[in-house]
UniProtKB/Swiss-Prot annotation:
This is Putative RNA-binding protein Alsin2. InterPro entries: Luc7-rel. Keywords: Coiled coil. GO terms for biological process: mRNA splice site recognition; mRNA splicing, via spliceosome. It holds the Pfam family LUC7.
Length: 420
C-alpha cells in the first residue's frame, strides 16, 4: 500500500488514507464513476503507472490522461478477490508501449554518439566497454550500500563497501589498459555511452560519486521499477492473454480496440500532438487572414495581380472570398473618384464666378478715380478668402470715382448661382 504524497495537507492525507482503506463508499454514498470505467487508469490500480513513478524527474510525463484515485484501487483490490478483471493484460500493454518508446530513444542516442564521436577499433572499444561495465557496477553497489546504511543495516553496508573496493582496483587496471591502447589526445576526449535502463548519457571519466548519484537517482530507479514490473507482468499476463484468445473470450477486434485506447506516452505521441497543434494553428491563422480586410499599401496593379494565384493556392475558402474583397475595393475607388469630381466642379464654379465679378466691376469702374478701383480690388481679395457660404450674400459696393454718383448697388449674381 503506497503512502499519500507529502505535498498534501494533513486533512487531504487523512481523507486519502480513508479512501485507500475503506474504498469509495466509506461515507455511505454511491459514486457514479466506478473503477471498471474506461476512464480509470488500470495501470494505477496495479500501482505501475509511469506517470506516477517518473513524477518530478527529468522524464516527467505530466498528469495521466486517465483518472487516478486511491479509493478506486481499494475497490479493485477487494473486488479482485472474487472476480478476474484481466486488468493486468491492459497494464502490460501500457508498459510495453512505454518501454518500446524508451528503447527507441536509447537506439537514437547511440546512433547520435556514433556519428559525433571518433570511431574506435574493436580492441579499444572492448576495453572501453569493460571500464564502463565496472563503473556501472560500482555505482549500483555504492547506491545500494548508502540505502542500507540509511536503513540501519550497517553490517550489510560494510560488506558491500568491501566489494566496491575490489571493483575499484579492477577499474583502475582496466583504465590503465584503455589509456595505453590509444593516443593521449584521443583519451582526453569525453567518451560517452548510453544507459540501457533510462537512456541517459554516462561518461567514462565520471567518478564514483557521480555514478552512484545516477544509479541511485529517482529517474534510473523509476525506469528500473517499470522494467521489473513489465517482466513480472509478461510472465503472468502474456499466457493469460494467449489463453483468452485461444478460447475466444477475447477477440482480435477487442484486442485492437484496447490498443487504440492505449495510453500514449513518450516522444512519438508528443511529436504527433505537436504536429496536430501546429497544423490547427496554421489553419486558424489562415481563416483570420481571410476574414480580415487587407489594405493595398499603395501597390500597383501588377503586384495585386501577382497575389491572386497565392490567395487561390492557400485554400478554396480564400479563393471564394477574393472576389468579395475586389468588389469592396472597387466601391471604395468609385466613391473616392466621385468625391474628387465634385471638388473639381466646385473649384471650376468658383473660378468662373470670380472671373465674372472681375469683368463686371472692371466695366463699371471705367475711367473713374483710382481710389474706387483700389477699394474694389481689396473687397474682391477679401471675398476670395471667405468660403462660398459666407460670400453668397456679400454686398458689393461701387464707388464710381469721377464718373459715378457713389450709389450703393447689391449684386445677387452669386446668390442666384449658388441656389442653382
Amino acid at each position: 500500500m503506497s503512502a499519500p504524497s507529502n505535498k498534501m495537507s494533513a486533512t487531504d492525507q487523512m481523507r486519502a488514507m480513508l479512501d485507500q482503506l475503506m474504498g469509495t463508499t466509506r461515507n455511505g454514498d454511491e459514486r457514479q464513476l466506478k473503477f471498471s470505467d474506461p476512464r480509470v487508469c488500470k495501470s494505477f490500480l496495479l500501482d505501475c503507472c509511469p506517470h506516477d513513478i517518473l513524477a518530478s524527474t527529468r522524464m516527467d510525463l505530466g498528469e495521466c490522461p486517465k483518472v487516478h484515485d486511491l479509493a478506486f484501487r481499494a475497490d479493485y483490490e477487494s473486488a479482485a478477490k472474487t472476480r478476474d478483471y484481466y486488468y493486468d493484460i491492459e497494464a502490460m500493454e501500457h508498459l510495453q508501449a512505454f518501454i518500446a518508446d524508451c528503447d527507441r530513444r536509447t537506439d537514437s542516442a547511440k546512433q547520435r554518439l556514433k556519428e559525433t564521436q571518433e570511431e574506435l577499433t574493436a580492441e579499444v572499444a572492448e576495453k572501453a566497454n569493460a571500464v564502463h561495465g565496472l563503473a556501472e557496477e560500482i555505482g549500483k553497489k555504492l547506491a545500494k550500500a548508502e540505502a542500507l546504511g540509511e536503513a540501519g543495516e550497517v553490517e550489510d553496508s560494510m560488506e558491500l563497501m568491501k566489494e566496491i573496493e575490489e571493483l575499484r582496483a579492477k577499474k583502475i587496471k582496466a583504465e590503465h589498459e584503455y589509456r595505453t591502447s590509444m593516443p593521449a589526445s584521443t583519451y582526453q576526449q569525453q567518451k560517452l555511452r548510453v544507459c540501457e535502463v533510462c537512456s541517459a548519457y554516462l561518461g567514462i571519466h565520471d567518478n564514483d560519486i557521480r555514478l552512484a548519484d545516477h544509479f541511485g537517482g529517482k529517474l534510473h530507479l523509476g525506469f528500473l521499477t517499470i522494467r521489473e514490473k513489465l517482466i513480472e507482468l509478461e510472465k503472468t499476463a502474456a499466457p493469460r492473454k494467449a489463453e483468452l484468445k485461444r478460447t475466444g473470450k477475447m477477440t482480435d477486434r477487442e484486442d485492437e480496440g484496447r490498443g487504440r485506447n492505449r495510453y500514449f506516452v513518450g516522444g512519438r505521441e508528443l511529436d504527433r500532438r505537436s504536429r496536430v497543434h501546429r497544423s490547427r494553428s496554421r489553419e486558424r491563422q489562415r481563416n483570420r487572414d481571410g476574414d480580415r480586410e487587407r489594405p493595398n499599401n499603395g501597390r500597383g496593379p501588377e503586384e495585386k495581380g501577382s497575389e491572386r494565384p497565392k490567395e487561390a493556392a492557400d485554400g478554396p475558402e480564400r479563393a471564394e472570398r477574393a472576389p468579395d474583397r475586389g468588389g469592396r475595393r472597387d466601391d471604395r475607388d468609385n466613391h473616392g473618384r466621385d468625391h474628387r469630381e465634385r471638388e473639381r466642379d466646385g473649384r471650376r464654379d468658383r473660378d468662373r464666378h470670380g472671373r465674372n465679378d472681375r469683368g463686371r466691376f472692371g466695366d463699371r469702374g471705367g475711367g473713374g478715380g483710382g481710389g474706387g478701383h483700389h477699394r474694389d480690388d481689396r473687397r474682391r481679395s477679401r471675398s476670395r478668402e471667405r468660403s462660398p457660404r459666407e460670400r453668397r450674400n456679400f454686398n458689393h459696393f461701387r464707388d464710381g470715382g469721377g464718373g459715378g454718383n457713389g450709389q450703393r448697388k447689391r449684386s445677387y449674381s452669386r446668390e442666384r448661382n449658388y441656389r442653382r
